[in-house]
Amino acid sequence: MSYFGTDGIRGLFGKFPITPDFVLKLGYVTGQVLVEQNPNPKKKPSVVIGKDTRLSGYVIEAALQAGFNSAGVDVHMIGPLPTPAIAHLTRSFHADAGVVISASHNPYYDNGIKFFAADGRKLSDEMQNAINDKLKTVVEGHADYTQDDPAQLGKHFRINDAKGRYIEFCKGSFPYQYDLSNLTVVIDCANGAGYSVGPRVLRELGANVIAIHNKPNGININDNCGSTHPETLQKAVLEHKADVGIALDGDGDRIIMVDEKGVVVDGDGILYILATKSEAKAEGVVGTQMSNMGLQLALEAAGIALERAKVGDRYVMQGLEAKGWILGGEPSGHILCLDKSRTGDAIIAGLQVLAVMAQTQKSLSQLTEGFKLLPQCLVNVRLEQMQDPYDFPELVAAFEAASKQIEGRGRILIRKSGTEPLIRVMVELDNAEECDKLAHELADKVKQVMA
């Protein structure tokens, strides 16, 4: 059994595995692995711990800290900052690992823990498996999770200037010859981890900034706001006659943009702009199975290859490393610009689009002219218990028949969510009405067979 999903460990706070007891054990065994792999026995291993704005983050933070300290690991606490800030500061502090307490775009009652390696990238499968194996023995009661020698305990430190360090890092990704003084930008902070740093970065680069959903109270994170609810941003951009809108998700690693006409530009649109309109045209782009066929066609027309990876920024990163490319992402707004940051970073991705606007003197709507997404319909089917739809012959036959029906005009993708008990039914088709009808028919079939 693996406790890790596609993006760390996630669930409902108070229910296994997101409980203080489990998190304490997780901190301890992860600390043990770091101690065992420590190349310098004269120096204790250290980790950086950051979080988003969920109320439960306080409890999880304390449990993790206790676990790591018990294992003999020093802890640098940085408080609420975006996930990519933890990745950056892990490298900056020469820490052995980074830990993020967040459930990303999920509601406040969920939470999770994900890890970064010392280089600021996602933890390797080998390291994750080593943690998982030790964790299993502790959870099952076959191993202890206390430190016998009090002299070997770790310490914890609060890093007071973490926010400023990350702001400077973000600003450093923006070309020095441009500024944002001619732009009015609305930023929707999702009442999440980017509520403070997002607006500050834009202001310090000269933009006139209107911040919305930037008053977190512990339970309003992602609540009808942020990258999963761009409608409030669309309205605000039009009301304020802004040049552009930026929506972050709860942990600040996803971005959705809105142009001056109130039209949403998703991750595919952002990749198109960065690949084709930047001063240095991309050699290739890594997307995912969810990347719209319209992106593939637009990139091909520009002489740029698109490689599809499995869903998840971890797999996009692996694809980029395999090809030696620097640009990749997902329609949901995970955008990786590896020449600027080692992980998906909403603020940095947004700055790269704003840099293209400054460089070309074009509006966001002008930059997406000629870029057309195929109509896409995504229906989520919630299950009591996760199962694989491809284990049901009746469903496999239905999927194959539907794919044959739209061959040459679109595509079908059916997959399990990596973070929730959901089956995602996605249809892309050149006709919007047919697309919607087919997606709901297939979702109803999944419900009927698997419920």
Swiss-Prot record:
One of the protein's GO biological processes: carbohydrate metabolic process
EC number: 5.4.2.10
Annotated PROSITE patterns: PGM_PMM
UniProt binding sites for Mg(2+): 104, 249, 251, 253
Active site: 104
Catalytic activity: alpha-D-glucosamine 1-phosphate = D-glucosamine 6-phosphate
Keyword Transmembrane helix in record: no
Molecular function GO terms recorded: magnesium ion binding; phosphoglucosamine mutase activity; phosphomannomutase activity
Function: Catalyzes the conversion of glucosamine-6-phosphate to glucosamine-1-phosphate.
Protein name: Phosphoglucosamine mutase
Organism in which the protein naturally occurs: Psychrobacter sp. (strain PRwf-1)
Gene this protein is translated from: glmM
